[in-house]
Amino acid sequence: MYDRLQAVEDRYDELNELLSDPDVVSDPKRLRDLSKEQSGITATVETYREYKNVNEQINETKELLGEKLDDEMREMAKEEFAELQKEKADLEERLKLLLVPKDPNDDKNVILEIRGAAGGDEAALFAGDLFRMYSKYAESRGWKVEIMDANPTGIGGYKEIIAMMNGNDAFSRMKYENGAHRVQRVPETESGGRIHTSTATVAILPEAEEVEIELHDKDIRTDTFASTGAGGQSVNTTMSAVRLTHIPTGIVVSMQDERSQLKNKDKAMKVLRARVYDKFEREAREEYDANRKSAVGTGDRSERIRTYNYPQNRVTDHRIGLTIQKLDQIMEGKLDEIIDALILEDQTSKLEHLNDAN
């Protein structure tokens, strides 16, 4: 571990020199990439330097205890030695976590996609409930939410809704929401009071920048059509809706939320870029995931990750066996208790894998 930490510190010093190099300063892309790399290892280097400083103090205190001291001085040195040992152990744990490979997408914005699945109108209503839950969570964290496209049912639900979430650490927290969400409740239309089970799927995609995924015009087919509202009726007579097809992957994105064809195409390109980026990234991870299945699941959108039981006011996350009797609060956007537990489980799993590799 310490060889790796020393290598990280050496790289940090090298980056400091590079960032003051006129050739680097005059190259915006390289400057940004190197600055991002340095920012990503700063906490590790600072903690490692603190660790080395504590180690030096421990050695000095050891030497002091080997000398002839009066009782009071010896007692003080012993207390200081014990405190330093505890501080060293704490720093070692922090360093282990800092060495866990960071998801390069963690600091990205999020494209959120929610779709009603099994359960008809009730599934669409639940999709709407999930979107409101995530919107309130985003508000609590100071993130901005912008609806990019929606297919409402007319009864307060959505067959599909796509939104952008902009804010610090958005992907690092929202990525654990990928998967199938199941609801158990009595629908308002149910006269017999029977509990129904419905499902909605959630996809969390990191926003991909143009420099990260290049989409060539020749690979994209663009179709335009008239926008339609709930029930299929036309909402305007102009051909403002846009459908983009990425020919190499077959990925299709339709957008009709805006009255402007140009705005719809711009939004569709953002979603298309994110979906293509996500597809390539998932394929690149397949071999790694085959060797180490994450403790918090595969991220597969068909994987059932959570159940929301309304009669019992209960939420269960099946990946980590966590049950919380606070469904009313969860649906108001108070998700941190669940997400923090998922992050801890994920970090613990990665740390165990790192220790096994060493």
Swiss-Prot record:
Cellular component annotations (GO), alphabetically ordered:
cytoplasm
The UniProt entry, under SUPFAM superfamilies, shows:
Release factor
Is Cell membrane given among the entry's keywords?
Answer: no
Cellular compartment(s) = Cytoplasm
Q: Which SMART domains match?
A: PCRF
As one GO molecular function, the record gives:
translation release factor activity, codon specific
Which keywords, in A-to-Z order, does the entry hold?
Cytoplasm, Methylation, Protein biosynthesis
Q: Which domain of life is it from?
A: Bacteria
> What PTMs does it carry?
Methylated by PrmC. Methylation increases the termination efficiency of RF1.
Which residues does the record list as N5-methylglutamine (modified residue)?
Q233
**Record carries keyword GTP-binding:** no
What does the record give as the function of this protein? Peptide chain release factor 1 directs the termination of translation in response to the peptide chain termination codons UAG and UAA.
Q: Which family does it belong to?
A: Belongs to the prokaryotic/mitochondrial release factor family.
**Which HAMAP family does this entry report, sorted A to Z?**
Rel_fac_1
Name of this protein: Peptide chain release factor 1
